[in-house]
Curated annotation (Swiss-Prot):
Pfam families: Com_YlbF
Gene3D superfamilies: YheA/YmcA-like
Species of origin: Streptococcus agalactiae serotype Ia (strain ATCC 27591 / A909 / CDC SS700)
InterPro entries: Com_YlbF, YheA/YmcA-like_dom_sf
Similarity annotation: Belongs to the UPF0342 family.
Domain of life: Bacteria
UniProt protein name: UPF0342 protein SAK_1409
Source lineage: Bacteria, Bacillati, Bacillota, Bacilli, Lactobacillales
NCBIfam families in UniProt: PRK13676.1-1
């Protein structure tokens, strides 16, 4: 029987070799080489982190914060580089979701 850690490492390498993973890397590099896209990306990450912290503490974003997030979403949608990045992330997430179901199936059997 193969070592479970060896199999996990093999899975990691297989994910990195997926064309969808490579497409996300390419899209990320494009964002990093464009100043406008990079600023929007950093704003998105900061906003996402702020909202997650609020929700974890049981708070909801104010109307003003929701409006800011909506405006940021519109800016992101209008930036071709970020749009491509999120589209590629979505394609990759399909694989990751399927893999997660497979890997966690034994745990479901125990519940």
């Amino acid at each position: 029987m193969a070592n479970v850690y060896d199999l996990a490492n093999e899975l990691e390498r297989a994910v990195r070799a997926l064309p969808e993973y490579q497409a996300v890397l390419t899209a990320k590099a494009a964002i990093e080489s464009d100043a406008d896209a990079q600023v929007l990306w950093q704003d998105f990450l900061a906003t996402q982190s702020k909202v997650q912290e609020m929700m974890q503490s049981g708070q909801m974003p104010s109307q003003e914060e929701q409006d800011e997030m909506s405006k940021l979403g519109e800016k992101i949608e209008s930036n071709d580089l970020l749009k491509v990045y999120f589209d590629q992330q979505q394609r990759l997430s399909v694989y990751m979701s399927d893999i997660e179901k497979i890997v966690f199936a034994p745990m479901q059997d125990l519940m």
